[in-house]
Amino acid sequence: MRFTKMHGLGNDFIVIEAVEGVDYSELAVKLCDRHFGIGADGLLVVEPSHIADIKMRIFNADGSEAEMCGNGSRCFAKYVYEKGIVSKQKMTVETLAGVIMPELFVENGKIKSVKVYMGSPIFESSKIPVKSEKQKFIDEPVKIDGKTYRLSSVRVGVPHTILFVSSFEESFMKELGPKIEKSSLFPEGTNVDFVKVEDEENISVRTWERGVGLTLACGSGASASAVVSSLLGRTRRSVNVHFKAGVLLVEWKEDNSIYLSGEVEEVFRGEIEI
């Protein structure tokens, strides 16, 4: 089976085209293993679509299928364009979270960056979902191991929960991340974003990704973090989101739509027996 390894700011993916009779969940676990496989945060599968130009399926490293992935969708768009599967620089992509619209910016025949319409943020507790009597779960006190944290949840394709911090301590994030992810508050689990506000136009983020763990970057996490930061008056609606490996631009428009922009790169191509 042929594959392509890609990444957006170190958030890496293996991209394959649909294969009949394959259990993609099992395949994701095998291929994403960083010791015995290719190594990646997730597996992206290219499939035909009846409602869009192309369909993207996303499987996390633990084999679970995700509804959407911001960085994954940007890698996916670059792949299908460069492979000639979709010839449009502005395309529609079917996902479990609905149809998204990546746009490729090409200079001298090379893709400079990819911008993707992430949809609109969902704040309604029951639709994130969060077990809460409040309509919105924003800046709410939650007690974990005897300590109280103020958490905010939003759905941007997938559930995200934001915690503002003054610094990034890896041991703290690795301990608290899975406790929030698997809390009974979140019936479907949640991604956890640790957010440090630098100024009104810049935030730094580290994401504990549901089914993955700490990642170098996360597109939907960048979007969720930017939206909540703006909602709470900490930043403007257009924000540079800084991850370990680089920066993503998130624009939360007045019409409630979110756009995510940044670079994506192909790492290598290869073949593997399955």
Swiss-Prot record:
Belongs to the diaminopimelate epimerase family. It is found in: Cytoplasm. Keywords: Amino-acid biosynthesis, Cytoplasm, Isomerase, Lysine biosynthesis. GO terms for cellular component: cytosol. PROSITE patterns: DAP_EPIMERASE (PS01326). One of its GO terms (biological process) is lysine biosynthetic process via diaminopimelate. This is Diaminopimelate epimerase. Gene3D superfamilies: Diaminopimelate Epimerase, Chain A, domain 1. Pathway: Amino-acid biosynthesis; L-lysine biosynthesis via DAP pathway; DL-2,6-diaminopimelate from LL-2,6-diaminopimelate: step 1/1. The keyword Cytoplasm applies. The active site is at 69 (proton donor), 218 (proton acceptor). The record marks 160, 209 as: Could be important to modulate the pK values of the two catalytic cysteine residues. Catalyzes the stereoinversion of LL-2,6-diaminopimelate (L,L-DAP) to meso-diaminopimelate (meso-DAP), a precursor of L-lysine and an essential component of the bacterial peptidoglycan. The lineage of its organism: Bacteria, Bacillati, Bacillota, Clostridia, Thermoanaerobacterales. Homodimer. It catalyses: (2S,6S)-2,6-diaminopimelate = meso-2,6-diaminopimelate. Pfam families: DAP_epimerase (PF01678). InterPro entries: DAP_epimerase_AS (IPR018510), DAP_epimerase_DapF (IPR001653). Signal peptide: none annotated. One of its GO terms (molecular function) is diaminopimelate epimerase activity. Its EC number is 5.1.1.7. Substrate binds at residues 11, 60, 70-71, 191, 209-210, 219-220. Its main location: cytoplasm. It comes from the Bacteria.
